[in-house]
Every structure is written in C-alpha cells, then in structure tokens.
Regions:
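N-terminal intrinsically disordered, acidic low-complexity segments at the extreme N-terminus
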Residues: 1-2
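Sec-dependent signal peptide cleavage junction
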Residues: 25-47
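N-terminal Sec-pathway targeting helices
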Residues: 5-21
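Collagenous Gly-X-Y triple-helix signature in extracellular proteins
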Residues: 39-237
Length: 237
C-alpha cells in the first residue's frame, strides 16, 4: 500500500514538472520571444536616421514560391514616441474605389477597406500589429471619429516628405507588376495618395515623373495604379 502511494506521488511530481515545463515553453513562445522581437524592432527604428530604411512585416514581393519577403520602409519622420513609415516600393495594385456604387471618398473607398483588412492581416504578425498606431481620420461629412492603422499618405505628406519630383518616383515589386501595376521604360510606376476628406470621386496619384496630380471620375476605378503603404508605429511599447 505504501509503495503504491509512493508511486502515485512520484507520478504527481512528474506531472507537475511536465506542466511547469510546458508552461515555460508556452510563455517563451507566446510572450517572451515576441516581446523581445518587439523591443529589438523598436530599437532598430529609434537608431535608424530619418530618411533611411528599416524592415518591418512581410509581404509577397518577388513572385516566387519562396514565401513572403520582409517589407522595406522609409522612415519619414519621428514625433515624440512614434515614427511614420512608408513602404520603399509599391507593394501591390488596387483600385481606389468603384464609382458605380456611388460617390467615393477615402472613408468608403475600396482601397481603404483592403488596406485595413486584407493587407493588414497578411503583412503583420500579432506582435508587429501591437506596434501599429491608430491614426485619426477627419471627415467633415461625419462627426464620428474614424481611425486607420494602415493608410495612404495625403497630398500634403507626399509633397512635404518628398519635396522633389525625383524623390517621389517609386518602383513596384515584381509581385505588384504581376497584379497589374504598369511601369515606364525606367521601371517607375503610378501610385495612389489619399484624397482630401471633403472631395468625392477625386483621387490623387504620383505619376512616372514624380509629379503629384489629381484625376476624377472613372479614373479612380483603375486597378493598374500601385499602393505605397504608410503606417505610424509606437516607439514606447
């Protein structure tokens, strides 16, 4: 009888040890390692000068079976404990909106929905998502606050951070070209920027020469323009 009790106690001890080991492994995989990666990412962004590039998130870019590639971002500015990043390359092709469904504003545009859902979930891990800040969207026709995690730069941002036409020129990834982005003889493409909150059926884009222009109406239905993604990231996580 005593021997049976001793065996049961030993089994219980082994079970407790096993549970402790499993708990440590789970915490390491789900908490400690992701937090360490986040801290490392924050340090990289903090240490990288404005105008230089960093890697953050992954997205298909070379159109091969090797899996997604790391996204390169240009650091546009740093404000207190956050940084504004824009993708170095055009990452995909997408239409701004479908005017056949009614008047299109940024708030109800198809490209905003795609960025906020499909792209956001495809490009970022949960730990990376924890660094991305909600950015308020002002909308004169709707008093309710709206927020974006992933967005297009505005005209003021495009012209403010890229002060010359040459600096606005952008090349797409091979994947973006395969999805319809058209390029000129030098490999540059057209890429969208966000329209003003008061305008309907009006989309901004940067052309092959780097000039920032607007077009209206059916033009915004075109899906051969590129998407250059922008995000704000938290540097005090």
């Amino acid at each position: 009888m005593e021997e049976q009790i001793k065996v049961k106690k030993n089994k219980l001890k082994l079970l407790i040890v096993a549970l402790v080991i499993v708990t440590v492994i789970v915490l390491t995989v789900t908490v400690i390692v992701p937090n360490a990666k986040v801290s490392k990412q924050i340090k990289v962004i903090k240490d990288t000068p404005i105008g230089e590039t960093i890697e953050f998130g992954t997205y298909e870019q070379d159109e091969t079976s090797s899996g997604k590639e790391k996204i390169e971002w240009i650091i546009l500015t740093k404000e207190e404990d956050k940084a504004l990043l824009v993708s170095k390359y055009v990452l995909d092709a997408y239409n701004y909106g479908d005017t056949s469904t009614g008047d299109i504003y940024w708030q109800n545009s198809s490209i905003r929905d795609w960025l906020s859902n499909s792209f956001y979930n495809e490009a970022f891990s949960n730990s990376e998502k924890s660094l991305i800040i909600d950015t308020e969207v002002t909308y004169l026709l709707d008093p309710n606050d709206q927020y974006d995690k992933v967005f297009l730069l505005s005209e003021d941002e495009v012209k403010g951070y890229f002060v010359t036409d040459d600096s606005r020129k952008c090349k797409p990834t091979s994947y973006a070209v395969s999805n319809g982005v058209t390029v000129d003889e030098n490999g540059y493409c057209l890429w969208w920027y966000k329209n003003p909150d008061w305008s309907k059926n009006l989309a901004g884009w940067v052309d092959y020469t780097g000039e920032a222009v607007y077009r209206t109406g059916e033009f915004i239905n075109d899906s051969n323009l590129g998407v250059r993604v922008a995000i704000w990231v938290n540097l005090k996580h």
